Design a protein with these regions (language model features):
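Acidic/histidine-rich alpha-helical segments that form the ligand environment
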Residues: 18, 53, 57, 77-126
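Long, well-ordered alpha-helical segments
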Residues: 8-27, 58, 102-112, 135-140
Length: 145
């Protein structure tokens, strides 16, 4: 159970960082296709934001505390921090990479939840994977010439 709890905490922190980055990109994107990027980034950050509490509740269901300090979240997160404000297409490329990182965290937690026969959590994680695969498709499609 400890491995599953740790995997969920990593997923929580990674999702939190993913939310912060995608929201930051949403408010800072500029360029000729501003509206298109702005709306896509809004979809991404709203989904990540909506799931912060849901992931936290899953951790609490496992009878553990949720990381809440920025220091702890940044140490657990697998999403690299944004050091500057890139151009719009670079934002999309970075978020495509970050989305795969989030998916890896979900798959790790899913594998452990399956071993623990935590089927409600398994179902939730499968739904999250489906949503992130959809975002990968949208982000990849945006990068096509």
């Amino acid at each position: 159970m400890d491995k599953l709890i740790n995997a969920m905490k990593i997923y929580f922190a990674t999702n939190f960082s993913y939310y912060t980055k995608s929201h930051g990109y949403h408010v800072n994107v500029v360029g000729p296709d501003f509206y298109q990027y702005h709306k896509l980034l809004q979809k991404v950050y709203e989904d990540a934001q909506e799931n912060i509490d849901k992931i936290a509740e899953e951790i609490r269901t496992l009878q553990s505390v949720v990381p809440f300090s920025m220091d702890r979240i940044s140490k657990l997160s697998k999403v690299p921090d944004a050091s500057d404000t890139p151009k719009a297409l670079e934002m999309i490329k970075e978020l495509l990479f970050d989305t795969e990182v989030v998916c890896e965290c979900i798959r790790d937690a899913h594998s452990l939840a399956t071993e623990q026969e935590a089927y409600g959590l398994v179902n939730y994680l499968e739904a999250r994977l489906d949503e992130h695969y959809r975002f990968q498709w949208m982000l990849r499609s945006t990068l096509e010439p």
